[in-house]
Amino acid sequence: MAELCRMDSTLTALDEEMLWDMLESHRCRIVQSICPSRLTPYLRQAKVLGQLDEEEILHSSRFTNSAMRVGHLLDLLKARGKNGAIAFLESLKFHNPDVYTLVTGLQSDIDFSTFSGLMETSKLTECLAGAISSLQEELAQEKAQKEVLLRRCQQLKERLGLAEAHAEGLRQLEVDHSRMKREVSTHFHEVLKLKDEMLNLSLHYSNALREKELAATRCHSLQEELYLVKQELQRASLVSSCERESRERSLKMASNLEPQGEELNRLKEENEKLRSMTFSLVEKDILEQSLDEARESKQELVDRIHSLRERAVAAERQQKQYWEEKEQTLLQFRKTQVDCELYKEKMTMLQGQVAELQKERDQAYTARDRAQMEISQRLVEKDALRRRVFELTEQVCELRTQLRRLQAEAPGGPKQEAGARELCLRGKQRLVRMHAVCPPDDSDCSLLSSTESRLWWDLNSTSSREQMDSFRSSSPMPPSQQSLYKRVAEDFLEDPESLSFPEVLEMRLQGATVDDTDTDLEFEMIDGADLSQTEDSLQGSSRSLNVSESSVPVRRRPARKILSQVTVLAFQGDALLEQIGVIGGNLTGIFIHRVTPGSAADEMALRPGTQIMMVDYKPTKPSLRATLENTTLEQAVGLLRRVNGSCYLSVKINTEGYKNLIQDLDAKVVTSGDSFYIRVNLAMQRGGDGELQTHCNDILHVTDTMFQGRSCWHAHHVNPYTMKDMEPGTIPNYSQAQQQLLALIQDMTQRCTVPRKPPGGPQKLVRIVSVDKAAVSPLTSSFDQSQWDSGKEEGGPSVCFWSESCFTLAPYTLVHPHRPARPRPVLFVPRLVGRILGKKLCLLQGFKQCSAEYLSQEEYATWSQRGDIIQEGESIGDHHWITRHAVESLMNMSTHALLDVRLDSVRVLHRMDMFPIIIHVSVNEKTAKKLRKGLHRLGSSEEQFLEVARQEEGELDRVPCLYSSLAPDSWSDLDSLLSCVRLAIADEQKKVVWTESPC
């Protein structure tokens, strides 16, 4: 038998029984080592198996394992005779060369000239055979590489065992290693899920191809029936015409029978010719269609071969990547071992130092207790002296009242009082605490009560006598340098209701002319008569005070009445950001986080936890007046950096908000107090590590406008369905992004490209949006802004960031989220597409056309005043309007309202709390031809449709919300476009709605 099987040509020379004897002798090995799904395609192509046989072998429930399927395959091939055996051996040559060599004793070299002749040796067969041989070579290489990797892996396992023997004490590192293993397993499960999804997609694709083939066969049968019907119609018309002509000729030529017979024969010949021509046309069309299908199937096979090669390359690349990750993990493991040993040595040293520090701490506690006892005794003595001072001040007030009464009676009173004042000055300026006098329009709060006056006079008298003393002696700790004024401010901020209205504190800082050793400062009390005179003078003029300095000390600037617990501090803010440091943002507010000791801000008792509400800086022209309550950290820092002189800060104590912000910063939950959402109007590539790659119309969540102190923003991509933060990274701030936008537009202009995105083309690069600089927005930084509006009144809200209104390009746009519960209305761009699809969508459940209502002049005026008119019904005529009531009635019925309105009506719908779904169908000349019938029904041509589509697509950039686009190659006919539109509407209904204008 071995001698007969030396040459491949001898196989075909053997008879059927000898061939099947060879196969049956090795049947056990064949059944165990062969996969039937690999052989059936070749056997079916060799025409020894049919499609039903293949499905029975692969999918029959009678065969529970692969061996039973192979056995049934051999039985079927044995029924085919010699051709079945030869085809089976040739399939073994391709897919199981070792089994082929075992059965025949020949080498499995593939020679295209030695095929058995069961198949046509066409180019397709040669291509498939070459592809199979190349795949076998690649498989052999991969197996060899796998063996090398297995040996290498075994060596690494031995080294890892040695490393684990040296690392028995490092249990913490083992925990980290197990955690990494769990992460790898989760990633592996994710990969398996992705593979399952890919398999499902391939199954769906195969089902779609099968449905397509069924539809094509149905179309062919219908075409054949159509041709047959046409042929019968022509035959019937010819028969009727022939009968008519024969009848007429019989009447005219009844006597002449021979010419009539010749005419009848001629008509029969013409009828036969027409019938033969008709059948030839039908056969020609059928052959052309079958040829096209054969070409398409050939192209699909070639594409599948290319995809398999790409998957093999991707698998090799992924294997290399996993190998590199393993090497990096081992290297990191060794580095961690070394670091752990170093940390152990450092811990032993630190423990020794901590023991020494504990001893020193105990000694310091003992010394502190002794000092506190001495300080407590001295404070008790000071309290007694302070009570004595209060008694003496009352006597001074009584004596001063008597002195003024005597001065009024005596003619030389003013001169004596002036002399007395000169004696009391002692050569230095007084530090006076004066009462805040309200402007004339707040007459109810113009004066303090007598109790409040006495309280503030007592505090200032104590402050003027002894700066280093403490006003409250309950604390055993010694007072600070400016404890008097600080405690006055603390009492005011902690108990704002103790006064009749919020006080305005003002202090003039003194230079080095004041002697530190001299602590006696002069003070004056304002009695009721003087206050009455002051009130009268203020009512006469709100800008100047007519009371002389020698008589009554009053405020140089009237106190302004501020609602809520807000205090206005006036001080010298030279280089304000060097005196204080701020944190926060537009979500939490701007807080003072650091105060430089000895600065003017420290003298004014500003402390961490104080929230800055407003800043007023007069020296700039125009003056700087801004509210910092809703500004970002970048804006607040830019505004405070411009302050360099005398300024007014409106502050309030917000300990709870500051504490929450500090806790979040320490826990690294946030990096600042900023939080807002933006829509990106340009595409930005990833420039470096940590930078975020964005596309046009992406939604980002900005969480820090001064990330790590740099001029960049920290942002996250936003999940369109749940609003959860996803990929983090940094993006340029507003000014840098605006420069990139201008550079991108200039580059596009120099290249003479059209700014409009071509249909079905690449990702959109730029969205041209112009905004008014006068609009309030937390996006623009104070560096980019102009001067602030100085024409605002003090009581008016200072919200305008720009001195004059002009338009500028916006790289980012502020957006706000909405979650509508009811079905949203639907708009189509172009509108002609909506009119074409409207009738078919109305036939489906959940869609209905919103019709225009007829309104009289009175009804229109009433509805328009309420803001319930959306747009006039253009297709119907005058007095027909699309109203809010019509849209809401459909939304309440859980129905999508199909609107035929312009894009400028989107803002009107947003003001009504309606957020339409905008479906943009990209069109070109090819897609216009697909909609030709619908356009003709609407009385529009393809050129007009394309022109209108370009105009409406240009208006999409001005729409204050996102929209869904359908590419031209995503649909082939009107039915597929309808299904794509339904899927897009369902997907948009699930998403969060982002609008640029707050609703």
From Swiss-Prot:
Keywords: Apoptosis, Coiled coil, Cytoplasm, Phosphoprotein. Residues 572-655 form the PDZ domain. The keyword Phosphoprotein applies. It holds the Pfam family CARD. Residues 409-565 are annotated as: Maintains the protein in an inactive state. The modification Phosphoserine is found at residue 541. Residues 125-411 form a coiled coil. Acts as a scaffolding protein that can activate the inflammatory transcription factor NF-kappa-B and p38/JNK MAP kinase signaling pathways. Forms a signaling complex with BCL10 and MALT1, and activates MALT1 proteolytic activity and inflammatory gene expression. MALT1 is indispensable for CARD14-induced activation of NF-kappa-B and p38/JNK MAP kinases. May play a role in signaling mediated by TRAF2, TRAF3 and TRAF6 and protects cells against apoptosis. This is Caspase recruitment domain-containing protein 14. It comes from Mus musculus (Mouse).
